[in-house]
Design a protein with these regions (language model features):
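Conserved class I S-adenosyl-L-methionine
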Residues: 1-36, 129-171, 185
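Class I SAM-dependent methyltransferase SAM/SAH-binding core
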Residues: 40-88
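A short acidic, Gly/Pro-enriched loop at the edge of an enzyme's catalytic core
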Residues: 86-98
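A short SAM/SAH-binding and catalytic strip from SAM-dependent methyltransferases
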Residues: 96-112
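A short glycine-rich, Lys/Arg-flanked "PGG" loop and its adjoining helix->strand segment in the class I
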Residues: 114-129
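Short alpha-helix
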Residues: 213-231
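Core SAM-dependent methyltransferase catalytic element
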Residues: 229-258
Length: 258
């Protein structure tokens, strides 16, 4: 997996919504985070849109130095640490709010989701908040995606629909299989670009998935709720209105009282 994320970092400018947060997502996250009036904010990853807008003193944690080097811009009250989200390099009860964008999908479901909830509960102060934009599964087949192709509005929406359509019943899909399924579904990339107006370099960015051992997971919203409890208690869920917004809800949770 070590080569997948450096490639992703180098091609960040080619990634768009819903894989990358749009203004609606940032507005939702900022509203939810502000409920905590945080002094100390943990950003899971180095998503530039989150780091630029979240309140409080920010510490960003990412496992990949290449992601930090490519995307993180230091500033007063802003620092980045190399570390694992399942073993955060932070003291107990040191964070008021943790916010992340889509990162749960890198975890193996359900075990790593449970471990993640426990680790967030460890670093959060009492009544601390967690704000997570999720990528959640809704059932459809590749034939459904093929039939919907004329109405799909962006390449990244297409890519995510393919990924969810081919994941296993255990909620796991190998990244390289997403590219293979795309090539089988759309054998003529030039024709796709001409018909849709999508930039060819955006379409070809899927080639970073070739031979990648990384895996993604897309559980349903209810499945996520179940595995994050009892460490984290749901406060609210907000669903945006853009394409695939129903698969990209923002879930706000509070550390359970002990």
């Amino acid at each position: 997996m070590s080569d997948h994320w450096p490639k992703h970092a180098r091609g960040w400018s080619l990634v768009g919504p819903p894989l990358r947060p749009c203004a609606d997502d940032i507005e939702i996250a900022l509203h939810e985070v502000s409920l905590a009036s945080p002094r100390d904010t943990l950003v899971l990853g180095v998503t530039p849109e989150l780091i630029a807008t979240m309140p409080g003193a920010i510490v960003a944690v990412d496992r990949e130095p290449a992601m930090i080097d490519a995307l993180f811009e230091p500033a007063p009250d802003r620092r980045a640490l190399v570390g694992e989200w399942l073993a955060l390099p932070l003291p107990d009860a040191s964070i008021d709010v943790a916010v992340g964008d889509g990162g749960c999908s890198v975890f193996a479901f359900p075990g790593e989701y449970r471990a993640f909830a426990a680790e967030l509960a460890r670093v959060l102060r009492p009544d601390g908040l967690v704000v997570l934009r999720l990528f959640t599964f809704q059932p459809e087949t590749l034939d459904d995606v093929r039939a919907a192709l004329p109405s799909i509005g962006s390449f990244d929406a297409l890519k995510w629909r393919i990924a969810m359509a081919i994941q296993s019943p255990e909620r796991s899909v190998q990244v390289s299989a997403i590219r293979d399924a795309f090539d089988a579904l759309v054998p003529d990339r030039a024709a796709l670009a001409a018909r849709t107006g999508w930039r060819r370099e955006v379409i070809d960015h899927i080639d970073i998935y070739r031979d990648s051992p990384a895996r993604y997971s897309f559980p349903t919203l209810d499945e996520v709720r179940e595995v994050l409890a009892p460490e984290l208690v749901e406060v609210s869920v907000t669903t945006p209105r853009y394409e695939l917004g129903d698969r990209c809800p923002t879930l706000t949770l509070r550390r359970a009282r002990r």
